[in-house]
Regions:
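Helical element adjacent to the flavin cofactor pocket in flavoenzyme catalytic cores
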Residues: 60-71, 92-156
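Dinucleotide-binding Rossmann-like beta1-alpha1 core, especially the glycine-rich loop
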Residues: 1-82
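Short connector loops/turns at beta-strand edges and beta->alpha or beta->beta junctions
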Residues: 2-6, 90-91, 221-224, 231
């Protein structure tokens, strides 16, 4: 389920909640900067994200959410009625208006990662694939990463394992990192008649107001991607 900003504030306080949204904005901008600087082709689409009211009684909720995003966190937002979003986004039986927020966009994550790797290799950096780090030691102001194939010494390390961190490598991280699992399914390529059935126009990422996270977007080749939490059966 998704935690509302009010609940976040009640649990973590106003300042920590602001930091959360600030990190989201900075992360989006930083990703776009990397794509531009490294000249990565990763199917960037959309110029915002949308939150869609899936029921008519949710429209006031998203209007309030959009106002809080703008007033409390400085995030650019815009409200769309059901009819307005039907013109620029999509229609359907679970579309009762929406709001957009920026900065946001969609990418192909595999192409993004491959682009970073390609750039690193072009700068003569070494990438060791399928090499498990068994232990990290700190020695004389630097780190030693020990593997079965050998060791690497570095002044700085970045642990970028997503949620699949190996317990015991860095004691400060033990018990603090959890995987957030998502199930994703993609349709075949849809023709114009099929897309026009719900007037699906936007390529921006979309989520709706259901408590259980549900997101979707149109891909550049006119397939539709659907995603939701993956730890449920």
């Amino acid at each position: 389920s998704k935690m509302s900003f009010k609940k976040m504030q009640s649990i973590y306080g106003v300042e920590e909640t602001k930091k959360f949204f600030k990190n989201s904005v900075e992360g989006s901008n930083h990703t776009k900067d990397i794509i531009k600087e490294y000249n990565i082709e990763c199917d960037v689409t959309g110029d915002s994200s949308y939150v869609v009211a899936h029921h008519k009684n949710k429209f006031e909720q998203i209007k309030e959410q959009a106002e809080v995003y703008k007033s409390e966190f400085g995030i650019e937002t815009k409200i769309y009625s059901k009819e307005e979003f039907d013109e620029i986004g999509h229609g359907g039986t679970e579309q009762y208006g929406a709001f957009s927020y920026k900065p946001a966009f969609a990418i192909n994550p595999l192409k993004f990662v491959n682009g970073i790797a390609k750039y690193a290799l072009s700068k003569k950096l070494k990438i060791f694939e399928h090499t498990k780090v068994d232990k990290i030691d700190k020695e004389n102001g630097s780190y030693i990463l020990r593997t079965k194939e050998g060791s690497i010494r570095s002044k700085k390390i970045v642990v970028a394992t997503n949620g699949f961190y190996q317990e015991g490598l860095i004691p400060q991280m033990d018990g603090r990192v959890l995987p957030v699992i998502s199930n994703i399914i993609v349709t075949r390529k849809l023709n114009e008649d099929e897309l026009n059935t719900h007037n699906f126009k936007t390529f921006s990422p979309i989520a709706n107001t259901k408590n259980l996270l549900y997101y979707y977007r149109k891909l550049p080749d006119n397939r539709i991607l659907f995603g939701t939490r993956g730890d449920l059966t």
